[in-house]
Amino acid sequence: MRKLFKDYEVRQYVVQVIFSVTFAFSCTMFELIIFEILGVLNSSSRYFHWKLNLCVILLILVFMVPFYIGYFVVSNIRLLHRQKLLFACVLWLTFMYFFWKLGDPFPILSPKHGILSIEQLISRVGVIGVTLMALLSGFGAVNCPYTYMSYFLRNVTDADILALERRLLQTMDMIISKKKRIAVAHRTMFQRGEVHNKPTGFWGMIKSVTTSVAGSENLSLIQQEVDALEELSRQLFLETADLHATKERIEYSKTFQGKYFNFLGYFFSIYCVWKIFMATINIVFDRVGKTDPVTRGIEITVNYLGIQFDVKFWSQHISFILVGIIIVTSIRGLLITLTKFFYAISSSKSSNVIVLLLAQIMGMYFVSSVLLIRMSMPLEYRTIITEVLGELQFNFYHRWFDVIFLVSALSSILFLYLAHKQAPEKHMAL
Amino acid sequence: MAALDRVKVLVLGDSGVGKSSLVHLLCHNQVLGNPSWTVGCSVDVRIHDYKEGTPEEKTYYIELWDVGGSVGSATSVKSTRAVFYNSLNGIILVHDLTNKKSSQNLYRWSLEALNRDVAPTGVLVTNGDYDREQFADNQIPLLVIGTKLDQIPETKRNEVLTRTAFLAEDFNAEEINLDCTNPRYLAAGSSNAVKLSRFFDKVIEKRYFFKRWQSRFLASRKERDLEEEH
């Protein structure tokens, strides 16, 4: 937490508490999954803990966090300072309304359940969370190999950087000289205007218009030029920063660590391509896998290689390891992305709102990853999740995830391709 | 008008402390209506009368370079910013009175700017830590400005002002505390305006009248050393 708030002070203690609580409960959920696999604790007590955990998390996600978000947004707008609570409640009710409406177009409502049951809430939270997860993983799946592999790095020499810096400084000098002219003109007008600036009736005004019209026209022209030059200087600055960053990456890739990451990048890219491929197949052939990868993998090995395996024993351990890895990497990836995002957009005014938004996103993300993890676990462990979460249409969620994942991956490929193409063209034009 | 001589002053500080508003106030005597984030560097020009009111009065342009960014940026951004630190004649350090972190970051800002511009005689040997002696020997005039004074409630004002007084002493610099949305603080004749004018005079003097400045500088140092001995 300290890392997130290193440069900006988030004064409100409440915000910090809420964030930590959300995070803590989400992690507890994952711990419960692991306990499930390992067989720790009594079965009924596990069930109880699951229920308790879910209730608390849903309470926080659906009731408390949105309310506080509304409260802080309203307190940022100076106009509505008086009736903060009232407006916060209004915002919260709007949120609940939209939240409810969200459920309508999806086939998740079954007539058996009442209005305020856990299943309803989870289904909606699940939809939002799954969408988010799919977007993030789609983008991550494409961005990861792009960042890691040095194949994509453009070649940047010191001369390029120096040339660009020189252009930047020249632009700044031009801006300065123009601003000097404006300042001098203003000063002389001010000094002259002191004498003339008593509009003695109609004629005085006409005289002041004709004497200064030449000066002011010139000034507005210069001002426009200055604005254009400032825009140019901003662009040049961003390009220079980009070049410096690329140069740093090139140097980093020459070290051992860089080479190691490069190697990983190749692996990752194969994995990502495979995932995209699987998603396409799932959608095209309209099939949702019944058995999890681990058991299938072991079955295939046993059948093809004819090795005598104690399937149950090994499947338990392997699935435990796999699930553990998935959990850890997804938590780590999420936190890193959140930290970067937070640095990029935070300011001292809105840091409270942003922290709460992040807590909300994180909570939804974790709830839905529990939903989806069910897919990767062997049959006997699935039962408890199915029990706890009630009768949700799990298949729907998996399909929805695949669709959004595919869409997000394809659009991020397109986006990165365009960005990559644009940059070398800009440098050619220099 | 004849070509006026040029002087470069950097305006440094964390994101959102009010550097752009401050620069606008200093140069146009008007409050900035719609402050937005500064990307890269924005420059503005202030016409300053050196030694106003004396027969030696001469007009100079002072360029205020307002560099945006945060002190914890990646090395690539820092090296990009470093291109603006060439040949500077003075530094204005801006911090937010309501945000303690921004005052603490001023040390790192000043080190970043001063390490870049190393004069052949006054080499700053540093490993990034702050050392008061360096600022005593520092030949580039500094000024510390605290903004958002209006947002501090009356009860806390004294405590905040003592803290900033210590800060300014550490930098061996003058300090001004004001609110960038109110031009009253820099009205002609107020003590703030006098301090500002003195600072700009010091910058110009160091740039153009080195001998005169040097003798004054050495005299003040000798005075301070004598004080410390007692």
Curated annotation (Swiss-Prot), chain B:
GO terms for cellular component: endomembrane system. GO terms for biological process: B cell differentiation; intracellular protein transport; natural killer cell differentiation; regulation of protein lipidation; regulation of Ras protein signal transduction; T cell differentiation in thymus. Residues 1-230 are annotated as: Small GTPase-like. InterPro entries: P-loop_NTPase, Sigma_54_int_dom_ATP-bd_1. Keywords: GTP-binding, Nucleotide-binding. GO terms for molecular function: GTP binding; GTPase activity; protein homodimerization activity. SUPFAM superfamilies: P-loop containing nucleoside triphosphate hydrolases (SSF52540). GTP binds at residues 16-21, 148-150, 179-180. Required for KRAS signaling regulation and modulation of cell proliferation. Regulator of KRAS prenylation, and probably prenylation of other small GTPases. Required for lymphocyte development and function. Not required for myeloid cell development. Homodimer. Belongs to the small GTPase superfamily. Rab family. This is Rab-like protein 3. It comes from Gallus gallus. The gene is RABL3.
